[in-house]
Structure formats: structure tokens, C-alpha cells
Amino acid sequence: MVTSVRTQPPVIMPGMQTEIKTQATNLAANLSAVRESATATLSGEIKGPQLEDFPALIKQASLDALFKCGKDAEALKEVFTNSNNVAGKKAIMEFAGLFRSALNATSDSPEAKTLLMKVGAEYTAQIIKDGLKEKSAFGPWLPETKKAEAKLENLEKQLLDIIKNNTGGELSKLSTNLVMQEVMPYIASCIEHNFGCTLDPLTRSNLTHLVDKAAAKAVEALDMCHQKLTQEQGTSVGREARHLEMQTLIPLLLRNVFAQIPADKLPDPKIPEPAAGPVPDGGKKAEPTGINININIDSSNHSVDNSKHINNSRSHVDNSQRHIDNSNHDNSRKTIDNSRTFIDNSQRNGESHHSTNSSNVSHSHSRVDSTTHQTETAHSASTGAIDHGIAGKIDVTAHATAEAVTNASSESKDGKVVTSEKGTTGETTSFDEVDGVTSKSIIGKPVQATVHGVDDNKQQSQTAEIVNVKPLASQLAGVENVKTDTLQSDTTVITGNKAGTTDNDNSQTDKTGPFSGLKFKQNSFLSTVPSVTNMHSMHFDARETFLGVIRKALEPDTSTPFPVRRAFDGLRAEILPNDTIKSAALKAQCSDIDKHPELKAKMETLKEVITHHPQKEKLAEIALQFAREAGLTRLKGETDYVLSNVLDGLIGDGSWRAGPAYESYLNKPGVDRVITTVDGLHMQR
């Protein structure tokens, strides 16, 4: 029985201004700035009901703290509010943010606090004197304001010196204190406000786990970049203030955490009492009216667009019996696009296959009608399954139907029929993930198929190009655990042994020792291969760029079991780091590899994985190009240990060490590097 399919309404928390429309990710991560004991007691001064209000509240509190140092706080607020100098106001806000954090960091030192108040008083006096007009010392540099700017630079230097003296030279303590004393307490207050409860100390200490894992990694990466910049370029008020401002965005990283709350855990909504009077129909609820869907499947091109309604020349949905309320059934982001799906029956064997080219399927709660034949199951009808007689034998998964490109008129006289290699195993493809933003369900495993040629009365296998198969979008209704999102995923059908494509599948990687079941993303590394012109540049780093290509080629596919993928990602990050500093350190460490047996064993493991890579031949061609155009193997026998292992894994005979095919054009006399100029021209030195 086909039932109405409705998307679940978004979860709305009491008092919240926005709706949570997407599914939250798995939230589990610790911020680098907050450790185990950092949130034992949380009691911040800034409180509010909404997470998104925190950055603005911090800025306002910082300005208030700075203006309190002046003689007339109201006059300072008026000057700041009425000013149109955007750059000047930004400079003051940056100074105020760092000033307030410095006050909190030096609360235990009266002497330091006195010095800070003095700096704040002088700074606010400059604001009053300047007036934040168009030509202001707080804005861009001007010759008329260079004396006032020198005073401001001196005050900023004093502020930084006070912070350094009271934090042991570690300015990162400011961001740590901000997270511990302000950010996490604010998150706790928002949770207590929205849920009408009081959090116990244990729950408060675990608030850091609410931050999205990917977002937390981004924050940690930005922290590392900030530390690196500070070491290279020194400190400045603007840089430190922007780093603190980044920490204030942490509450916004709780991506829809409330969406994970079960509906039965939410507060009971207040239901109004029914109005007095007789209840129509004896108080019984009217049965929902079924949706009649008439679908005409033709052998020509057809596409269905149900952004508001389904109405196409090839596929038509009749909603005359029932109006679909888009507030409950939102199809605005569900698109069924079969523009690239073709069925050509012109070359099929008439004796072995017989069916009509079109069928009419009608969906309702109790029946499925067809103009040509009665389908055996409601599931095959609701998913738009094509009978075996339409295009040969098409084996589909439990939730999706694929139509293959079999247009033989432009290829040859023999038709091509796509059949499944897993037809006898009964294995089905599972829906591994659902993207809530694009409303698309993604199949975790590709549909494996083989192309056969049909020649009159005999059928033979043949080598063919890769055929792109798109699963047929279906309503997916009446099936247990109904999937309401539309399926539109590209599936690669492996049909040939052409170089640079996938050879059968990734089964070769099952032989890689501890990483059994490891599969790689196909052709993802091609985007990282630079052009020949770029290789000729005098600043081109052939070694790091080539190792980057190998690192991308070794990126595990999502179909790899998670424990294997996680273990291999760790090995890949250690041996092929995406960081020039770490790569140089590893290269130096491998110069005496015999003293590091564990590292040597890991290198051998990675070499074995590279040896069994399904696109090894293509990677070997790229290595040859790097050697020929960028001088990758100029050192030959003296090539470093990491690069040597990678090349040995790709080129098993070791010919790269002395072979003429790997001679770089740079080794030839009279050949110089090419310089890439700004205007795109090239010249030789």
C-alpha cells in the first residue's frame, strides 16, 4: 500500500528565533583551548538566550570596559556611535577587545591593572581629541595625523608589553581564558534558558563535546596558524584581537545540536481546548486521501521536475484528487533528473525479449494499475522498476533502479545490455548517508555491471568504455524505513581495462596486509597534477608536489571500512604529511633510517600499498612526467628515502635510478629554468 510521504517538520525550540532545518552531525571533539579541568566551574558575566548573540555581546562589553577608563563614558559612546569612519571604529573595537581580555588576565595583579587603566585613560582621551572624523588617526594613514598615530602605536605597544609580562610571554593564554571564562559559560546559560533547567557540574564539564568535530579541527588549525604567524612576524594588537574574535564564534559552531533531541524529550506543547459544540463525523478522524500518480515510462529522453509539481511531457503526475500542502510536503529541493538516462530497444533480440515501450502506473493506497500488465509488487511499481523485457536484464538494489546507456545507433550494430555482476548474490546497496542540505540520498556502494554485446541470437562479452549509470529517481514510498529524499547519484559501471580507469574494481587493495578491504577514490589525484608550464618554473618544488599527488591518490574511498580507513589515514598523514615543515623533518629523519626501525616498517607498509594501487600504471606515467619535465629524479641513487620508496612502489624494476627514459630535460646542456612572470609571459634566464 502506497502511503503519503511527508518530510518531518523542523524541530523548534521554545524561545528560539530560527528553525533548525538540517540534521546535526555527530558532535564529539575537544577544543584545544579547553582541557579536562578547564570547565569545572563555569560562571561568566555575559548571559543571553541565543548562541548567535554572543559575538555582539562581547564587543559591547569590551567597548564598555574601555570607555569606563575615560573621563566621560557617555561622550565616548556618542562619538563612537555617530562616527562614519568605519576603519577608525574597527581599530577601536580591536583595541577594546584586547584591553578587556588583558583586564581579566591581570585581575590578580593590582600593579598591572593600574598600568592598564592608565593606558585605557590615555587611549580614550585620544578618541575624544580625535573625534573619529573623516581624517582620523584611528583610520588609514594620513600625513596630517602621523603624530597622533605615533602616540596610538605607543599605547598599543604598552598594552602588549603589559600582557606579555603577566602571561609569561604566552599570549595564547588570553584566548584560553576567554573560552574558559566567557564562551563556555555563555553556552551553558543558553542551554539552561532554552530547556528551563539547571546543568550539573558534570554536564558543564562536558560542554566542549557539543562542538562539531570538523569545526573544532578548524579552530585548532587557525590556532596553529596564529601561533606560526606570531613566531614569524611578532605580535600586534590587530592580529591578537582578531584571534580573540574568532574564539567568540565558537557558540555558532554548535551546529543544530538541538536537532538531535528526541521529540518525546521536548516540552509538551500547549494544545488549545476544543471549542464547545457537536463534533462532526462522530469525532472520527477523516482518512487521508491517497495520491494518484500516473507515470508514463517511454524509451526516449524524459525528465521530471517536481520543484512545485510534477508535469512533464514524458512523466506526468496527476494531483487532481488531492492538493499537496508544501508546508508539510516540501519538494522544492527534490529534483528528478533523468536527462542523461536512455533506453534504446532498437537492437534488442525480439525473440528473447518482448515488452511494450511504455507503461502507465497508477499509485494509490490499495492498488497499482498498469496499461500493459499488472506489476507483481507495489514496491517495484513505486520505485519505477523496469521489467526485464524493456532493456535486457537489469538487476537493481532494494531501493534504487538504474537505467544504462544503450544507444547503439551511434556505436555499432550490436546493442549493449547492462547486467549486474551481483545478480545471484542477493546483495543490496544500503543508503549510507543522507545529506540534509541538498535532500539527496547517497548510495554507499556503486552498482557493479558488465556490458555484453547482443548479436542476433548469441550474446558475448566484450571490452567497452566506462558507462555512466544514473539510478532512476523514485518515490520510495510504501517501503519499510521509507527514504523521503530523492536519489540522484552517479554510479560508475566498470566495463573495461583502459589505462587510467578503474581495473575491474579495487579488489587488488585487499592484498595490502593490515589494510584489508582498503579502497581508493578513483582519479581524484588528477586535479593535483600541475601543468608542464608550471613544472618548468624555477620556483617549482617537484618533490613536494609529486608526493602531494601520491597523497591524494592514496585517499581512501568512503566504502572502506571505517577502522581500516582511520588507521590508513594515520599512516598516510605520518609518511606523506601535508605540511612542508613536517615533510622536511621526516626527510631528515629518514637520512639515517636504520636507527628508526618502526619508521622503516611503516615505509615498507606504505610501499606495499602503493604497489597494489589499482591505478599504479597511471601514477607511474605521472612520475615519468615529473622526472622528465621537473627533474624529479636528477639525484638518482642519492634520492631521499621517502621519495625512493614511493618510486620503487610505482616502478618495481628500479629503472628510474639510471634509465634514460627518466632523464630530465634539465640535465641537458644549454637548458635553463623558465621564469613565470606576473603578466603570464615566460622567458629564459
Curated annotation (Swiss-Prot):
Segments crossing the lipid bilayer: none
Keywords: Actin-binding, Secreted, Virulence
Domain of life of the organism encoding this protein: Bacteria
One term of GO molecular function: actin binding
Disulfide linkage: none
Single GO cellular component term: extracellular region
Compositional bias (Basic and acidic residues): 315-337
Ranges for region Disordered: 265-386, 404-432, 494-514
Residue ranges, compositional bias (Low complexity): 291-304, 417-429
InterPro entries in the record: SipA_actin-bd_C_sf, SipA_C, SipA_chaperone-bd, SipA_N
Subcellular localization(s) per the UniProt record: Secreted
This protein's record includes keyword Secreted: yes
Annotated Polar residues bias: 338-349, 369-383, 494-511
Region (Actin-binding and polymerization): 497-669
Pfam family membership, one: SipA_2nd
The UniProt record lists the keyword Magnesium: no
UniProt function note: Actin-binding protein that interferes with host cell actin cytoskeleton. It stimulates actin polymerization and counteracts F-actin destabilizing proteins. Potentiates SipC activity; both are required for an efficient bacterial internalization. In vitro, forms a complex with host cell protein T-plastin increasing actin bundling. It inhibits ADF/cofilin-directed depolymerization both by preventing binding of ADF and cofilin and by displacing them from F-actin. Also protects F-actin from gelsolin-directed severing and reanneals gelsolin-severed F-actin fragments.
Similarity comment: family membership: Belongs to the SipA/IpaA family.
Protein name stated in the entry: Cell invasion protein SipA
Organism of origin: Salmonella typhimurium (strain LT2 / SGSC1412 / ATCC 700720)
